[in-house]
Amino acid sequence: MGIGKLSSAQGVSMDLKEFFPESGHIQRLYCDRCNGHLDLVFDDFFETVSGVEISISGLPTLHCPKCNEKYLPDDSRFAVIHLHEQATKMSSDIVKVTRHKTNQNFGFGTVPFIYDSDDYKYIPGLKRAGDQGFLTPVFFNREVLLKYDSSPTYRLSFASTTYGEIRRGDDFSMPFGLNGNGKVVMWLGDIARLPETEQYYLRSENIESDHSIGSEFYDGQIESVFTALSKEDDLFKARSEFLEACFKKFGSKVAHLDKEVFDLSVTFNAPIVDTDKERRHVADTLNKIYLESFDNKVLGAVVKNLGGDPKSLGSIKRLQKFIELSCPTLDASTIMNPFYILYDLRVAYSHLGSDESGEEKLQYVSVRLGIKPDSGLMEIYPSLIEKLHESFTKLTKAL
């Protein structure tokens, strides 16, 4: 049994030595069995430890939701050790206590945010010698990010669909993450650096902690571990870098994430089956994220400032004109090719089975991607994702 790991059967006798850490051992937020992230839960502990029956109600415990393993955080193990020592001194073989939550106010700022000080104290990696409470996780509805995406002062930058930064100018950034339950997580100390008006806005979307912080956000911020991105996350990151480059050059946000698009980007995964329903879902979702999210009004204004006339141009043609004028060193038609293919893919999949035009357009999509004309979704999808990524990357470098 590993250090701090709980017995699978409650009531099985344990040796007190099991609660003392081995030299160099540090309890981390990863399961020993599956390496998945652990959540903080408050469990009832009932074990016989070296002859003393110890019962603790609400003991902070780390739980793996994947394989149901449980581990004790360091302070919980020390609590068991302390209770055993007290019982031994009093010649008692039974200890029964109810733990009360710490409910500590760490004193960051004047806005009363909802957070759980137990998260800071019991989630591995958050406690620091200085700035006590700085890394306390504060949880929000994910709609909280939409204001910053539409704000003229702030902007969002994504390293992946679940890890990003809120930026202001070139000298301020605040990291955020999305946990496995779709909640936005930020650090209490970072929030306190915001103007008070912004803190009150955040407070309006502030929710109770669900004690689940394992994510790319945690891995990067606490463990300095950056896992390889999926092709979907890598494409979304490339889009974000392009939008950031546009903002720095033109001072305008040429695309936005409304609630629907943001939800789609967070939950979207690569297709695993080739069905009519999956085809339409993939094509519609990619269109909404990578085409429809462009702000035609802003693109038109930039085109006009660069000497072009956007009046007679539709949305996709307006994007092409923007590229022609802002990136003259690039072949705009080549850069735009994946975007036209994406548009045609949705049209093709929406007409399949109803007329021949859908099948013809689908073959044309495959030909332009450089794959077999009769290719299905499982061949088209990875090729299109790669082409879109190439275009965003080239655009960012050209800007």
Residue ranges and their predicted role:
Residues 46-61:
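Short linker/helix segments within small regulatory modules
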Residues 11-25, 68-70, 74-79, 88-341, ...:
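Amphipathic alpha-helical interface elements
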